[in-house]
Amino acid sequence: MISAAVEPHVDAFKPDNREPLTPDFATTGKAPGAQRQHNPNKRKILFVTSEIADLVKTGGLGDVSAALPRALAHLHDVRVLIPGYRQVMESDNPIHIVGELGGHAALPPCKIGRMDMADGLVIYVLICPELYQRDGTPYGANNGRDWPDNHIRFARLGLAAAEIAAGEGKIHWTPEVVHAHDWPAGLAPAYMHWRGLNTPTLFTIHNLAYQGVYSRGCSPELAIPEHAMQQEGMEFYGKLSFLKAGLAYSSHITTVSATYAREITTPEFGCGLDGFLASKAQQGLLGGIPNGIDESWDSATDKHLQHNFSINDWEGKARNTQEVRELFGLDDSEGPLFAVVSRLVYQKGLDLTLGVADYIVEQGGQIAIIGRGEPEEEQAMRELALRHPGRIGVRIGFNETDARRMFAGSDFLLMPSRYEPCGLSQMYAQRFGSLPVARNTGGLADTIECGVTGFLFNESTVESYREALSRAFYVYGKKDLLNAMRCLSMTQPFNWCQAVEPYARLYEDLVKQTQLSHY
């Protein structure tokens, strides 16, 4: 609604032992969104993102873009810039026009709207109907195909961030740090660099595999200077990459876990950018800060659950298990229930789950699968369920309530990801007493303690996966051990206060470094 080769040194940015930032936040883990206190030392931080869970979300990026600004609110004045998709423009939150931006090359003029959320978060909406107000997702049509003009759509987002940083648009607020997220925001640091702006920039990689690669011929319509098409710039194997632009021109780079920050400097995980990223790491310009999860992930109070439970009362857990069995058409069973809550794509290692499914069933287990993704993966899951009626159930699609009930009702969560920058599902599952069986990679390695809060396996092979599953079956047969592991997993500190201090220190360091460079 509108009204007018060498092991790189990667800094993990681990929280230090200084006094808590605010007593209530440190003890409760709650981001004091609406209770925004006056802090004369607040820095102005602009988040640039293609999605935010309040309004439009396709994955973990949307969750982080919604939660992290709120978690930082008591320390900094954090605002979010997002395209004015149809879902955004048609939300119940009023949008007030606060500024205008002119066109440049093929990037059209647009307006800037301001949306004030109930808890005080300010969202700037980039209003350009010809680019953003379409049916579908932020990235493509409902048929799954990317919009052919995505290079223009997200270049406009990056340019808008640079214009706001330059004080254009007359919104009467100028950021001291611009924090861009993933490839759709990758041109924000680049446009700022090309304009000679001194505002420091931070670029966060949520998934290196998505790189926003386009033809070099797009450069003129995006106003990309010729000198940028060099190896040290945004050139990527003869094409241009929005993600590499963010890496090349930002003041600092973070990923969403310390292990992933190390992994992406290697050929196995670097997606063709390992050498470039290893160089950044050796310069001290790459680090990992883990994501947190929202406080609503509490099995004792979650309103999505019909049967709440806690480490002192397991009855609700058993009732949730029965509910999930009924939802997926599974037989009554004394065996363990394994859950898959995932995008059905190659990255998630679902072919490995197909390879161990017979073993799980033979050992007396059941599998409930929910998700959507590639048509071939979806069909493979359907066929798997047909082979094992009453033992394996599949629901193609995604529903927040059903997902939460699966975490609450399952005994184990299957996450055989080939790579996992951070991962949220394993944290959700642990909070609800479902022990992850996961590959030892990325954020999974950082958030699961093998044999204590879950089970890890090293190789992307059926054999390695099966060995971890055998350990899970063993623990399931030892109820005292099972409940002890559940208790430990449910009390893990996965809230956002783990990320607030390192981000706050990093913003301050970036501002001070910029100030010192001008003395």
Swiss-Prot record:
The gene behind this protein is glgA
Record has Transferase as a keyword:
yes
Q: Report the catalytic activity.
A: [(1->4)-alpha-D-glucosyl](n) + ADP-alpha-D-glucose = [(1->4)-alpha-D-glucosyl](n+1) + ADP + H(+)
What GO terms describe the biological role, i.e. biological process, of this protein? glycogen biosynthetic process
Transferase as a keyword? yes
From the record, give the cysteines joined by S-S bonds: none
Which CDD domains does the UniProt record give? GT5_Glycogen_synthase_DULL1-like
Instruction: Tell me its family.
Output: Belongs to the glycosyltransferase 1 family. Bacterial/plant glycogen synthase subfamily.
Q: In which pathway does it act?
A: Glycan biosynthesis; glycogen biosynthesis
Compositional bias, Basic and acidic residues, is annotated for 8-21
Documented EC number(s): 2.4.1.21
Q: What does this protein do?
A: Synthesizes alpha-1,4-glucan chains using ADP-glucose.
Q: In terms of domain of life, where is this protein from?
A: Bacteria
Q: Name the InterPro entries on file.
A: Glyco_trans_1, GS/SS, Starch_synth_cat_dom
Question: Keywords for this entry?
Answer: Glycogen biosynthesis, Glycosyltransferase, Transferase
Segment Disordered: which positions?
1-40
One Pfam family in the UniProt entry: Glycos_transf_1
Recorded source organism is: Pseudomonas putida (strain ATCC 47054 / DSM 6125 / CFBP 8728 / NCIMB 11950 / KT2440)
Protein name (Swiss-Prot/TrEMBL): Glycogen synthase
Catalytic class of the enzyme: transferase
Q: Name one GO molecular function term.
A: alpha-1,4-glucan glucosyltransferase (UDP-glucose donor) activity
Q: Which residues bind ADP-alpha-D-glucose?
A: K57
Regions that span the bilayer? none
